[in-house]
Amino acid sequence: AQAAVVGLSGGLDSTLAILITSVAMRLMDRPASDMIAVTMPCFGTTERTRDNAVELAERLGATLRRIDIGAAVRQHFKDIGQSMDDHDVTFENSQARERTQVLMDVATSAADWWWVPETSLSWPWAGPPTTATT
């Protein structure tokens, strides 16, 4: 696979991440379409941030993937007994962790490298996908 995967929410952190990735792709003489911008709407996604993410990916020439994580997060809440009405740290971080999981799975199947600027988790993940050896 010859791609870079970036989670794109339409917010500041992911905007900077895809802009940096775009510059890196140009420096490596790679086509913009080798950037896979993954937007993962859920409960807190606004129309504005969703539209910002889509427009930015299109303007940069990235390949855009939309993966709705709402059903997965709702199932997780059901599993752990989290109320949809309780907008606490668990509510927010469950969405962030699901996005990280989705991005890592997309990256390991499609990318040479990936970047998950997930500020809700308090640390960024970056690096090449890993593979297990037997």
Spans of model-derived segments:
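FabD-like malonyl-/acyl-CoA
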Residues: L12-A24, N52, L56
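Glycine- and acidic
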Residues: A1-L8, A37-T39, S83-T90, T134
